[in-house]
């Protein structure tokens, strides 16, 4: 008789994805982030579900309902801070996962990569709408500023913004619909994750060398299940340390003030994981130009397979490209720092230089360097 896990229609899918999956034997810890992202999504959906049981999406009671969760609900404070800081862990894993893909040339799996970009946009939209829900000062003004960017779209912009708001300003209708979208989007993300995995398992995983690893595959279980569990323990340790020792470290103090449309906070800024894109947006004086730069700062990921000039897939054996990759990483840290600073000298010019450098490295320097490396190796 065939093994149950290999014969049952449902178990067969799980078996082929997580148990008997042939995996390259040399994948490093950078390949852990896929499973960590899955864990983050699970944590966010679970904690979010329990928060939604006590939250009210009304402008008059939203702020109070979050306070009520923290003060009166059993372990409500734990669920709330796990959800808020879980989002930060989610984005840390996302950035590292994308960085891994860029470094080792995983973007050559086009379908998997493109679904990944759609996933990134979906998760960013979810996080943005979630930030609006507590209805603090930064929630309200963040929602106002970011939705207002759509008014830069010619001809239909203003109508579009008012349609999204459900009125002439961010108000009750906006909060209610943002809650509805924030609730449904993670399930859409989960469905997209399935598609992401489906396409990945069509080709099999990449590996650090960037070479074909069909001759050296090992089963996913027990080798990588145990490796993923170690990663998961580290993730949970970091998350719980953050939640239990300094839950407000990554938050904004302004969000402990209830939303007031009549008083603008001195510095409106999004959560830390959007600051790099916010810095790029602000570095262009023109509104439409800024919005386009903001969108393309993420969409630029889609052109990576097209600008792969190097004969080698991975950067593992390409020291010049490695140097550029780490300069790009440092540039993103710089942009994140600038995004949190006020719009004044010298931050304006630093932000503009960092923005130009970001696009230049990807569009000009990386392809040029790949050409040079090919020539050096007489390819």
Swiss-Prot record:
Transmembrane stretches, by residue range? 33-53, 77-98, 113-133, 178-198, 226-246, 288-308, 320-340, 347-367
For heme b b562, which residues are the binding ones? 83, 182
- The entry's a ubiquinone-binding residues are 201
Q: Which UniProt keywords apply?
A: Electron transport, Heme, Iron, Membrane, Metal-binding, Mitochondrion, Mitochondrion inner membrane, Respiratory chain, Transmembrane, Transmembrane helix, Transport, Ubiquinone
GO CC annotations, alphabetized:
mitochondrial inner membrane; respiratory chain complex III
> Which PROSITE patterns would you find in this protein's record?
CYTB_CTER, CYTB_NTER
Which GO biological process entries does UniProt record here? Answer: mitochondrial electron transport, ubiquinol to cytochrome c
Gene Ontology MF terms: metal ion binding; ubiquinol-cytochrome-c reductase activity
Q: Which Pfam families match?
A: Cytochrom_B_C, Cytochrome_B
Q: Which Gene3D superfamilies match?
A: Cytochrome Bc1 Complex, Chain C
So where does heme b b566 get bound? 97, 196
SUPFAM superfamilies attached to this UniProt entry: a domain/subunit of cytochrome bc1 complex (Ubiquinol-cytochrome c reductase), Transmembrane di-heme cytochromes
Provide the cofactor note recorded for this chain's UniProt entry.
Binds 2 heme b groups non-covalently.
Cofactor names from the entry are:
heme b
Specify the superkingdom.
Eukaryota
Its chief place of residence is mitochondrion
Residue ranges of coiled coil: none
Q: Where in the cell is it found?
A: Mitochondrion inner membrane
The membrane topology term of the UniProt record is:
Multi-pass membrane protein
Statement: the UniProt record of this protein carries the keyword Transport: yes
Miscellaneous note of the record: Heme 1 (or BL or b562) is low-potential and absorbs at about 562 nm, and heme 2 (or BH or b566) is high-potential and absorbs at about 566 nm.
Function description? Component of the ubiquinol-cytochrome c reductase complex (complex III or cytochrome b-c1 complex) that is part of the mitochondrial respiratory chain. The b-c1 complex mediates electron transfer from ubiquinol to cytochrome c. Contributes to the generation of a proton gradient across the mitochondrial membrane that is then used for ATP synthesis.
Assembly, per entry: The cytochrome bc1 complex contains 11 subunits: 3 respiratory subunits (MT-CYB, CYC1 and UQCRFS1), 2 core proteins (UQCRC1 and UQCRC2) and 6 low-molecular weight proteins (UQCRH/QCR6, UQCRB/QCR7, UQCRQ/QCR8, UQCR10/QCR9, UQCR11/QCR10 and a cleavage product of UQCRFS1). This cytochrome bc1 complex then forms a dimer.
Q: What is this protein called?
A: Cytochrome b
Highest lineage ranks of the organism?
Eukaryota, Metazoa, Chordata, Craniata, Vertebrata
Q: Which gene encodes it?
A: MT-CYB
């Amino acid at each position: 008789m065939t093994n149950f896990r290999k014969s049952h229609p449902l178990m067969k899918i799980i078996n082929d994805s997580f148990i008997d999956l042939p995996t390259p034997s040399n994948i490093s810890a950078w390949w852990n982030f896929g499973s960590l992202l899955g864990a983050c999504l699970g944590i966010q959906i679970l904690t979010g579900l329990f928060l939604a049981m006590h939250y009210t999406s009304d402008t008059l009671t939203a702020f109070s309902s979050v306070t009520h969760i923290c003060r009166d609900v059993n372990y409500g404070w734990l669920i709330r801070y796990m959800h808020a800081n879980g989002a930060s862990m989610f984005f840390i894993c996302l950035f590292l996962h994308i960085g891994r893909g860029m470094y080792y040339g995983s973007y050559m799996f086009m379908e998997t990569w493109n679904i990944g970009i759609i996933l990134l946009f979906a998760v960013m939209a979810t996080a943005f709408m979630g930030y609006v829900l507590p209805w603090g000062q930064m929630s309200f003004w963040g929602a106002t500023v970011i939705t207002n960017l759509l008014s830069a779209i010619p001809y239909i912009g203003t109508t579009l913004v008012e349609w999204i708001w459900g009125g002439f300003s961010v108000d009750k209708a906006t909060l209610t619909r943002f809650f509805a979208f924030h609730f449904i989007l993670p399930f859409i993300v989960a469905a997209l994750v399935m598609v992401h995995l489906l396409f990945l398992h069509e080709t099999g995983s990449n590996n650090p060398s960037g070479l074909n690893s069909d001759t050296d595959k090992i089963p996913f279980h027990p080798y990588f299940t145990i490796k993923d569990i170690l990663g998961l323990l580290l993730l949970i340790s970091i998350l719980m340390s953050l939640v239990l020792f300094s839950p407000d470290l990554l938050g904004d103090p302004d969000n402990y003030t209830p939303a007031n449309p009549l008083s603008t906070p001195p510095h409106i800024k999004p959560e830390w994981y959007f600051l790099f894109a916010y810095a790029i947006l602000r570095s262009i004086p023109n509104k439409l130009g800024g919005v386009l730069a903001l969108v393309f700062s993420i969409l630029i990921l889609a052109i990576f397979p097209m600008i792969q000039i190097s004969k080698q897939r991975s950067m593992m054996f390409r020291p010049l490209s490695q140097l550029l990759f780490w300069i790009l990483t440092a540039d993103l840290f710089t942009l994140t720092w600038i995004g949190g600073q006020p719009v004044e000298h010298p931050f304006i010019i630093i932000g503009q230089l960092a923005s130009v450098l970001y696009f230049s490295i990807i569009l000009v320097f990386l392809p040029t360097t790949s050409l040079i490396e090919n020539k050096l190796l007489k390819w």
